[in-house]
Amino acid sequence: MTEQNESAFNENEEVNEETSQTDSVENNDETTETSQDNLQEDDSQEIAEDVDPKDEEIQQLKKDVQENEEKYLRLYAEFENYKRRIQKENQTMKAYKAQDVLNDILPTIDNIERALQIDGEDEQFKSLKKGVEMVHESLLNALKNNGLEKIETEGQQFDPNVHQAVVQDDNPDFESGQITQELQSGYKLKERVLRPSMVKVNQ
């Protein structure tokens, strides 16, 4: 074998040796990666296996408790609203329980007021009228103590919420829209209008 051939042979052997080493390293790397993947899978399986069913049950119970607490709070709020509504309705009923009775009494008051508008010169008539005035005043005071209030009219500005205009007037002594005369008394029970006042309104 010539020196040139021997040199070429040696070079080929060195190249083959390096290639073998490279392949061996790559194979080792692949084996290492595969082993790591297998270890990770094993760890995941172990973690899954380590979860105690009791812990899962506890978590579920906590969740159920929280849901029940929320339901309870909602029901409690609804019940409190219901109680307040009932209390308000009871207070309203109590405040206006005399409404029907007062409505029945109003015509009697009207008759008394009409009688008081009659004038007479007779002493006996004057004495009788004075007695009726006292009864009228006493009756109104008693009704006032129970929440009845007479609606103000003459000289007031017309308010459709409490006044009923039945006649239009043309009086220079009053401003436009001002009440010049009350034709029938109106009454309120606390804030509720039992009957609007019938009035004459200046145009």
Curated annotation (Swiss-Prot):
Disulfide bonds: none annotated. Residues 1-10 have a biased composition (Polar residues). GO terms for molecular function: adenyl-nucleotide exchange factor activity; protein homodimerization activity; protein-folding chaperone binding; unfolded protein binding. Residues 39-55 have a biased composition (Acidic residues). InterPro entries: GrpE (IPR000740), GrpE_coiled_coil (IPR013805), GrpE_head (IPR009012). Homodimer. This is Protein GrpE. It comes from Staphylococcus saprophyticus subsp. saprophyticus (strain ATCC 15305 / DSM 20229 / NCIMB 8711 / NCTC 7292 / S-41). The gene is grpE.
